[in-house]
A protein has these predicted regions:
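Short acidic/polar active-site loop segments enriched in Thr and Asp
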Residues: 124, 182-183, 213, 245
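Short beta-strand segments enriched in small/hydrophobic residues
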Residues: 15-20, 58-76, 183-190
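Hinge/beta->alpha junction and helix N-cap segments in small-molecule ligand-binding domains
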Residues: 73-83, 102-111, 161-171, 187-233, ...
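N-terminal helix-turn-helix DNA-binding module of bacterial transcription factors
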Residues: 1-58
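Alpha-helical recognition/docking segments in bacterial nutrient-uptake
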Residues: 62-174, 178, 235-239, 253, ...
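Flexible loop/turn connectors
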Residues: 236-346
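Conserved hydrophobic residues forming the short capping helix/wall of the S-adenosyl-L-methionine
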Residues: 43, 92, 207, 235, ...
């Protein structure tokens, strides 16, 4: 096992300085960025892994217990956390070593203010979810003292677990086209990360390829109320004379609000536009809504399992270079929109 003393000898710096930097205390001790980079580079080159059993955490965990922090944004995505949490717990139950999960809520664009992440004194590793553009820039510019895995984000120097966001949008557009739709509207919130933009871009590209006219998009709040109010407003204005054949929703929550608004206005059964959502909410809510909601399913539980595997792999020294994993997605047809043609005969 590579020691702090060996790293100090490699770079010609005192062991105490190396210990301060690897312990996340460099800023408060005013150690230069150049020195920090030299130490981190040597640690990576030599394959240094922190001695987790010896590290003393303020939380008072046992010598063999690993503390993994889950950073989750304090916004509309808070309601989506349970599915991810369930996936983490299911995977942790398979491991022999005890792992304690700790939730750290944070405000988008302010991840850099999370001392638990930058100090390394409260946890052995972290899974960062919902990072914004500014948060990703912070991560790219920073050498963190603990292993980090990103959920559904890509950043140089970090392990990550992702899905093909372009394909998510494309599958929805193809399903609409296969159901004979000619016009489609989009209900989504303002994009807070590149994946949201990619989903809509994929939807437009695939829609245009199949002759689907995509109506001008206007953003709404990401939630049930946001979907309800967006559809109610459009029914009084631009959709008053002519409904679109289809509506693609950026989240399950937006879709449930949209369905309520259509129902109140008398658009039920065959009168209802085809509707597909990015399936990021509870699966039961989508399956048992009236009508049941067709989704391009986001496999959050599976992504969580992969995240914790990458965390443990880094802590055990099995993963020493950043690794990204891309998980498959699928379209789940229900009552709000029928199947893709290739599956229609099955």
């Amino acid at each position: 096992m590579v020691t702090i003393k060996q790293i100090a000898q490699e770079v010609g710096i005192s062991s105490s300085t190396v210990s301060i930097v690897l312990g996340g205390k460099a800023a408060e001790r005013k150690i230069s960025t150049a020195t920090q980079e030299k130490i981190f580079a040597a640690a990576a080159r030599l394959g240094y892994q922190p001695n987790m059993a010896a590290r003393s955490l303020r939380g008072g965990s046992g010598a063999n217990e690993l503390v993994v922090a889950m950073f989750w944004a304090q916004d509309f995505r808070a309601s989506m956390m349970l599915r991810f949490w369930d996936g983490l717990r299911a995977e942790i139950e398979k491991t022999a070593r005890p792992v304690r999960l700790v939730i750290y809520p944070y405000v988008n664009d302010h991840l850099k203010e999370s001392e638990a992440l930058t100090s390394g004194a409260d946890c052995h590793a972290a899974i960062i979810c919902n990072a914004s553009y500014a948060d990703l820039q912070f991560l790219e510019d920073t050498q963190l003292p603990i292993p980090v895995v990103l959920y559904n984000r890509v950043c140089n120097g970090y392990c990550s677990v992702n899905v093909d966001d372009l394909k998510m949008g494309a599958l929805a557009a193809r399903a609409f086209a296969d159901q004979g739709c000619r016009t489609a509207a989009v209900l989504t919130s303002s994009p807070v990360f590149e994946g949201m933009e990619n989903r809509m871009h994929g939807f437009r590209l695939e829609g245009e390829h199949h002759g689907l006219t995509i109506l001008a998009n206007r953003y709404c709040e990401n939630g049930i109320r946001g979907g309800y109010e967006a559809v109610s407003h459009r029914l009084r204005h631009e959709w008053k004379q002519q409904l679109p054949d289809a509506v693609f929703c950026g989240s399950s929550a937006i879709a449930h609000g949209a369905l309520r608004a259509f129902c109140e206005a008398g658009y039920i059964g065959e009168k209802l536009p085809r509707l597909i959502a990015v399936g990021n909410g509870p699966e039961e809510s989508d399956a048992f809504s009236i009508p049941s909601l067709s989704v391009v399913y986001l496999p959050m539980e599976d992504m969580a399992r992969e995240c914790i595997q990458l965390v443990l792999g880094q802590l055990d020294g099995q993963i020493v270079t950043p690794e990204s994993r891309l998980l498959p997605i699928e379209y789940v047809p229900r009552e709000s929109c029928g199947p893709l043609k290739e599956y229609a005969a099955q």
